[in-house]
C-alpha cells in the first residue's frame, strides 16, 4: 500500500512541478500503460502513452537505480505511470488555463508539461498495486484478494487502517 505522505514529501523535497507515481513492469505489461524514461535522479525525460515495438524498447530504463535488485530490474525494465500525480498548484493551473481542451493526463497534460520545460519527477513504488481499469481486471484483482493463507494485499494492517463507513463490529475474516 502506498503511503501518500511519502509521495507528497518526495514531490516537495525534489522541488518538482509534477511528480508521477511509477511502477516497474515487464514488457508484456508495459504496452498497456503510459511509460516514462527517466535519468539517474528520477527526472522524467520522456513520456509515451502505450508504446509498441521499437518505441517500447526505447522506454526501458535501469530500474535497479530505484532500489530493485539486479535480477528484478532485468525482468521489469519499464516505469509505468500509475495514474497518481502530485502537481504544484501553479503548474496545474497554468497547464489547464493554457490548454482548456486537455482532458487526458497521459496523452495531453504530461507531454505538455515536458514540452514547456517543467520539472517532472518519478516516484517509484514497488509494492502491491493493480490496474483495475477494466471489468475483467477489477474482477481478477478482487478474486486475488481471496487467496489464502496470504492474499497479495491485506486489509488487516494496524499501521495503515482503511476507513469506511462507521461500523461497530469488525469485518469478517475467513481463514482456512
What are these regions (language model features)?
Residues 2-86:
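Conserved core of the sugar-phosphate nucleotidyltransferase
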Residues 65-75, 87-176:
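Left-handed beta-helix
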